[in-house]
Amino acid sequence: MRYRCPMNCPSLRNQEYRREIMISEQLMGRGIRDPAVLAAMRQVPREAFVDQGMRELAYEDHPLPIDGGQTISQPYIVAYMTEALELSSSDRVLEIGTGSGYAAAVLSRIVHTVYSVERLEELARGARQRLESLGYNNVEVFEGDGTLGWPEHAPYDAIVVTAGAPAVPKPLLRQLVVGGRLVIPVGASSFLQNLIRVRRQGEDDYRSEELCGVRFVPLVGAEGW
């Protein structure tokens, strides 16, 4: 379904219009159906999470560079991973890899609280300031090794990892509630992975399924690369 611009629609340079095109073509057009995810993607201004010089590209469906040699994921992947978490409004979510803070902002529109861990100090500081200035008050950002999770606030209903790991970090598995979901890119290559969803069925019972092929920057840390 293509978004139809009304007669009084602003020009194509208008970011709200571009956001609607993103929703209809990149997300709904590729199978994203969760109303809460679509609403969150509509509410969060991606252009506020990229450098000034990149804002014209904010709603293109590809990653964009941010500080520290990292990237902000393409909108479809953010929506896909968020939908794969099967979230509810009461959930507490752990995000590994804050980056610019965009995905945390999207999550914050759906769930009760988001805890986000970023290993790079400049990114953690920038994301924290950006999220606070934009009013995302249910997000907490911590600078640290994301492969170890954030045990002080565990357990979590859902965990999402935004970098590729050689294997699922055991500390993250232990920080899931029973019934919780973990979505993470995993692969033998540091730049080519399969997106995996792990469900904690019981105290020591975890079931995993492959969702799709993805390409993420490496997950660096004690339990990563």
Swiss-Prot record:
GO terms for cellular component: cytoplasm. One of its GO terms (biological process) is methylation. It catalyses: [protein]-L-isoaspartate + S-adenosyl-L-methionine = [protein]-L-isoaspartate alpha-methyl ester + S-adenosyl-L-homocysteine. PROSITE patterns: PCMT. Its main location: cytoplasm. Belongs to the methyltransferase superfamily. L-isoaspartyl/D-aspartyl protein methyltransferase family. This is Protein-L-isoaspartate O-methyltransferase 2. It comes from Pelobacter propionicus (strain DSM 2379 / NBRC 103807 / OttBd1).
